[in-house]
Amino acid sequence: MPSKSLSNLSVTTGANESGSVPEGWERDFLPASDGTTTELVIRCVIPSLYLLIITVGLLGNIMLVKIFITNSAMRSVPNIFISNLAAGDLLLLLTCVPVDASRYFFDEWMFGKVGCKLIPVIQLTSVGVSVFTLTALSADRYRAIVNPMDMQTSGALLRTCVKAMGIWVVSVLLAVPEAVFSEVARISSLDNSSFTACIPYPQTDELHPKIHSVLIFLVYFLIPLAIISIYYYHIAKTLIKSAHNLPGEYNEHTKKQMETRKRLAKIVLVFVGCFIFCWFPNHILYMYRSFNYNEIDPSLGHMIVTLVARVLSFGNSCVNPFALYLLSESFRRHFNSQLCCGRKSYQERGTSYLLSSSAVRMTSLKSNAKNMVTNSVLLNGHSMKQEMAL
């Protein structure tokens, strides 16, 4: 639909009661359709960026899931959640990104009523899986660092799989209203030409989009991030307190342990930071449009902001494997070995501990005199004391 101008357009079917143009559909348009340099550049550059996002995202996330599935040492509670993130990203990359890219080649909605109902549900489900999984990961890091005695390994993987499935169920249920209200409508211009478009909430009043955008921002952004912030506040406080309280003669031993804990928490925090950076502009833009329901901004600046927000939000689906590659030595080694087609899969010696605090049973014996914590690790039935690192 990019070739349609924003001016002289109206909704002839599926219009809201006030007769105003529904929020949402105008974001798919370029400012003009006269073959200008701007239009031609956008038609080429944006789909190319989408193709890059799809290619890189599929490679990284498929490799991530494959590594966790094929290497038993990598199967842990945090890694199950990370695989859940990758699955949600793959869903978005395989469905929503190609559909969005097609809008720069075709003047009309090409995916029918079913596609109009399904695509918004898939996108919101993917966002829900991402932010709710990040919240669950933060809770896991909180328990591992602040309350290590509460970490139980008996049935932990099974319980985590159930939690991951629960995240999907909740995300799908929350996205169902998108399918209920989205409709394919025909947009008419004053020159008697018309085209079809997928419009969210076309038959509602001005209040509905405002409520919807605020709820989306709260449920899928602000509230989860507030919970994550609380978890990380307590994590930071515990790490600082532990560094001050541990006796000097054990500094070398505890330093490695502390670095491991901080590294694990850092990985999750980087994931959260990437999510905020990529999705915040999209949330703000959606609320801006919802609160300016009757106005259409045909300016080049608004169009550029819209395109940047879209590219950033879709780009979030390919950044997590890169972050993990940079921050985790174990994942980096396994990833490199997978890329080397002629080599055997890298078999890691010793204990792999990529976010695997729950893959082992840890019991803490606290000394009242020296406030020292000694971890006794049980792995495959054998007791061993060691410092585990990425």
Swiss-Prot record:
GO terms for biological process, alphabetical: antiviral innate immune response; G protein-coupled receptor signaling pathway; negative regulation of interleukin-6 production; phospholipase C-activating G protein-coupled receptor signaling pathway; positive regulation of interferon-alpha production; positive regulation of osteoclast proliferation; positive regulation of respiratory gaseous exchange; sneeze reflex
Comp. bias (Polar residues): 1-19
Gene label: NMBR
Topological region Cytoplasmic: 66-79, 140-156, 236-266, 328-390
The keyword Glycoprotein is assigned to this record: yes
Residues modified to Phosphoserine: 352
Name this polypeptide is given: Neuromedin-B receptor
Keywords from the UniProt entry: Cell membrane, Disulfide bond, G-protein coupled receptor, Glycoprotein, Lipoprotein, Membrane, Palmitate, Phosphoprotein, Receptor, Transducer, Transmembrane, Transmembrane helix
Pfam families cross-referenced by the UniProt entry: 7tm_1 (PF00001)
Function: Receptor for neuromedin-B. Contributes to the maintenance of basal sigh rate through signaling in the pre-Botzinger complex, a cluster of several thousand neurons in the ventrolateral medulla responsible for inspiration during respiratory activity. Contributes to the induction of sneezing following exposure to chemical irritants or allergens which causes release of NMB by nasal sensory neurons and activation of NMBR-expressing neurons in the sneeze-evoking region of the brainstem. These in turn activate neurons of the caudal ventral respiratory group, giving rise to the sneezing response.
Biological source species: Homo sapiens (Human)
CDD domains the record matches: 7tmA_NMBR
Known tissue expression: Expressed in epididymis (at protein level).
Location within or outside the cell: Cell membrane
Family that this chain belongs to: Belongs to the G-protein coupled receptor 1 family.
